[in-house]
Structure formats: C-alpha cells, structure tokens
Regions:
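S-adenosylmethionine
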Residues: 1-178
C-alpha cells in the first residue's frame, strides 16, 4: 500500500524467491510506471501494480494476505539529508496537518487484509512519534485482534539525520491474532 517507487515491493519479492504474488498499490497512476519498470529491470514477475486509494478498504482483499506492507505518507523527517528543501519546514507543525488522520485511515484499511496469523508492517520515513509510535499505539488500543511483534525507530540519533547525512525511519510489525 502506498507502494511507489517500489523499493519495499522489490525487497519483498527478493525474499519470496519468485514465489507467490505481490499487489503493489499507489494512489497515483502516474507513479505506477516506476514500480512496473523497476520490476521489469530486476526480472521480478510476481508484482502487479495498480492504482487505488489505500485509505479505502478493498472488499476483495479482506483476509487474503499473508503480509501487508503499509508504507504511509509522512512528514519525511527521517530523510532530511536527501531533501534539503524540507529543512526549512522542520519548525512547522507538520504533525498537526492531515497526515496523522490519513495514516490512521490507511492503517485501518490495511488491517483488514492479513489472514489470521498474518503480518502487517507499518512504516514511515519520519522520526516523528506522533506519526509512528503514537499511531501504532492508538491502532492497537482500538484493535484487540492485533498485537505488536516489534516496533523500532531506526536511527542512532533521532535528532540528527540531516547532519549525519543518513536516513531514519520507523517500522512496526503487527500480528493479526483474530
């Protein structure tokens, strides 16, 4: 979900050794060529890219997936080193924007797709707790059928990604229990 440009789909395909099927969704049709071209360049045949609004549940996918990667739109504070234009906005209150509400809707829709025992990976490229830990904690409080297997912010010093010229990101692996 929110798959363009396709890096996580490509990594998942490599882990799957060409077995199974990956559905890579993105809101914008114009971004799907990045996924399709990347898959072709890498010789990956198990990826199908399609345009869809990930914040809206797809009845055809409910309970059908072993694993769902939910890489939501975010403020991007973990990739400031790559995006100098964002540095000027660091002081802005991005967390108070509509992003957390959109993230919550996408996570809620994504949570319908794993089978019982399946996994849901929630990820962002931000270090903002409001978009990360707090988002997952709120989801778990409202969804007793899920538990958290692991939750981790990846960056040695969450305050300094731009200065050290490295990226930071967050992920949580959730298990569907019922």
């Amino acid at each position: 979900m929110c798959s363009a440009p396709g890096g996580k789909s490509f990594a998942a395909a490599a882990l799957m050794h060409g077995e199974g099927r990956i559905m890579s969704y993105d809101l914008y049709e114009s971004k799907l060529s990045l996924i399709r071209e990347g898959a072709e360049r890498l010789g990956i045949e198990i990826i199908t890219a399609a345009a869809r609004d990930s914040s809206q549940p797809d009845p055809d996918c409910i309970g059908a997936a072993d694993c769902v990667i939910c890489d939501v739109p975010c403020s991007g504070f973990g990739v400031l080193a790559k995006k100098p234009d964002m540095r000027a906005r660091v002081g802005e209150r991005i967390a108070d924007s509509e992003l957390p509400q959109l993230q919550s809707r996408i996570l809620a829709a994504a949570s319908l797709y794993p089978r019982v025992g399946g996994r849901l990976l929630y990820s962002t490229c931000t270090l903002n707790r409001h978009e990360n830990e707090e988002q997952v904690e709120a989801f778990l409080a409202q969804n007793s059928g899920y538990s958290c297997e692991q939750m981790h912010t990846v960056f040695p010093d969450p305050d300094l990604p731009a200065y050290l010229r490295t990226d930071g990101f967050f992920y949580a692996v959730l298990i569907r229990n019922t």
